[in-house]
Amino acid sequence: FKKRRPGVIVGRIIAGHGDTVAVRRGWLPAGAPILPDDPVFGDLAPAVLEDVLAGGRARLIGTGDRLTFIEPVLPLPRLIIAGAGHIGKAVARLASRLDFSVTVIDDRPEFANIRNVPEADEIILGEIGESVRRVEESPDNYFVIVTRGHQKDAEALRAAIGRDAAYVGMIGSKTKVELVHCEFLEAGWATAEEWDRVHAPIGVDIGSKSVEEIAVSIAAELVEVRAKRREPARP
């Protein structure tokens, strides 16, 4: 779980002789093989465990002399905020209350610290583009790029664009976004298809002006994207 892997926790109560019972429990990461002689998982159908994970709901199964409780463990989606300035701080504050695991990246010690962003689950002090590049790959990553300038934004975007992520968004006016768009395509840093997946200008258009309003618009877009990803696929 510390490695952000989804999986299931299984608890089993098995009737023995007389009034005795055996209690067994264990953790199984998603995709891990099940050995036939495993005392906890051995006789469980992999499809049952996969269904619990896919549905995100616990299941209680009673069969014969045993009772089995299967609980999914789904790590929170990871929000990576490039930039710990006023907007980055405000987004971190909101996202921490919206069931995101928040990582904040900045190259300035006076910003990349727990006093500045106390709501962050992880703070990375380092060169912004390289730090974004080193973020572990996951389809549940959400990248929000709100650094202090055009160059830093572009560096962070180069590291995030084209990755298997749920969301990549960059702050900026329509003029700035168009300049970055042209720069990326002309330099070969992104394909047109990759650029089309970038949310820029970032956030839901609510006419936001203040830092807090901008943060609300960004948080709303994050929640919207996450909700759409959770919708069951239509046949």
Labelled PLM ranges:
Residues 166, 170-235:
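Adenosine-phosphate binding glycine-rich loop
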Residues 1-107, 111-124, 138-142, 183, ...:
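Segments forming oxygen-rich coordination pockets for charged ligands
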Residues 11-15, 145-147, 171, 199-201:
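Short beta-strand segments
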Residues 94, 155-160:
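A short acidic, amphipathic alpha-helical/loop segment
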Residues 126-131, 151:
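Conserved SAM/SAH-binding loop
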Residues 89, 154, 178:
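Alpha-helical elements of the RecA-like P-loop NTPase motor core of helicases
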Residues 105, 142, 147-150, 158-184:
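ADP-ribose/adenylate-binding Rossmann-like module
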Residues 129-139:
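Short amphipathic alpha-helix with an adjacent loop that forms part of the alpha/beta core around
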